[in-house]
Amino acid sequence: MKTMTKYLGCLLMLLAVAIVSEPVQAASGAMSCVAKEKNRVTENAIDSVLVNGHMRHYRMVLPKMVQPNTPLVVLLHGYGGGNLNDETCMDSVAQRCGFALCVPAGLYDPKGKRSWNVGYPFQEGWAVDDVDDLCLLTKYVQQKYGLSPTDAFLTGMSNGGEMCYLMAYRNQTMFKAIASVAGLTLQWMYKGLEPQRPVPFMEIHGTEDRVSEWTGDLPNAGGWGAYMPVPIAVNRLVALNRCTHEVVEEVPVLNPSNGHRVFLHRYLGGDAGCDVWLYQVVGGTHCWHTVDMNTGAVIWNFFSQYLQR
């Protein structure tokens, strides 16, 4: 099942955030934190709002002192997730770096699972436009909590990662950059949609992911619908953003004992600075990586390049 799996590594996240800065800096510059020490205390709130006739529930992680330029990250759960009482592995990064975090819950799909409508075969006929709903929810949250009206970013894992691709393909203007973890481009998106608006995009994916296969699943053996191999999906966005060249480097891992290797592919020179990054976790499985890398810190490092731009 494509769920946002909880790992023991989440319990060590505060430590991992602190020690990840050196490996991340080696690949892409130091992790950029916008908060002062006194602003790192956060507040949690669970709330809801009616959006397009749907009651949308969400959890907010807010800096103690919200500023008019406080950025927002929206985090989308995996298939069947959506328990707003659970702390995510992005919470500690928000606490450290001072951005606001919104964790919305998906609606119940035809199978009775909370999910995002990305066009899985079993979602056929489900009249929910999560692209529009999430953009409206984000705007509402920005206004309600006095956040930056321009610095909003989107990330998600698995089903939430697929929603990230769909958001990019639908030419949205709400999110300045998008990051997917173990997400996929379904074949219907790849062939049926014509993305036209460049957007900075990052994918983090394990090569041994047996749920969201690195090599794709065009025969639809897994039942999620036919989807493209990860390199082909990423290259579509590279072409969209008109990136001019690729830089590949191996990133030091947090725990070398498992034998995994992480390669960062950066596609640079994109229109208006819209670059595409791909973290290839060799040997990595279907997870929010906390052993090889601090995924939350890596995501924020990517997003922070596009603050107030």
Question: Where do the PLM segments sit?
Answer:
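Accessory cap/linker subdomain of secreted extracellular hydrolases
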Residues: 207-248
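Bacterial N-terminal signal peptides
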Residues: 9-18
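Short substrate-entry loop that stabilizes the transition state in hydrolases
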Residues: 66-112, 175, 187-188, 211-213, ...
